[in-house]
Amino acid sequence: MIYYANPSAATACFITDSAGRLLAVRRAKDPAKGTLDLPGGFMDMDETAEEGIIREIREETGIEVEAVSYLFSLPNIYPYGGMRVHTADLFFAAQVSDFSSAIASDDAAELVILAPDDITPEDFGLESIHQAVGRWLARKKNQNR
């Protein structure tokens, strides 16, 4: 029997409000504890990527998102328990009217609402998230031309 070392599936979401602000979370746990992150996490068995990110958003922010749209994916290596876990990180977007019902919980120590001009990829501690934020900002800039 041959075993293929395939990546684990993980999700993250760019959640914006009607003012165009981005909802980020401050990581409560290592790796990259204390840095900014996007709501998201590993998918559970028997759930779609969309179900997984909607669940993670609810767990980390308390926000009930009804729909997400797929943006892009990035390969990643996630340090966990002394291991290097290869992941396929799937990035989504969601829009909400406001963040008034949001509350930090689960892996999120704090919620951080960022105005578009205050979003800096380097503030996001995990490499794939850092890359994704840069890519997302470039897309936004191109859309506004």
Residue spans of the language-model regions?
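A generic structural signal for short beta-strands and their flanking turns/coil linkers
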Residues: 9-11, 21, 32-34, 66, ...
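Conserved Nudix-box catalytic region and its N-terminal flanking loop in Nudix hydrolases
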Residues: 17-59
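Unchanged
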Residues: 43-67, 74-128, 132
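Conserved positions in beta-strands of structured domains
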Residues: 14-16, 71-72
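A structural microfeature
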Residues: 24, 69-72
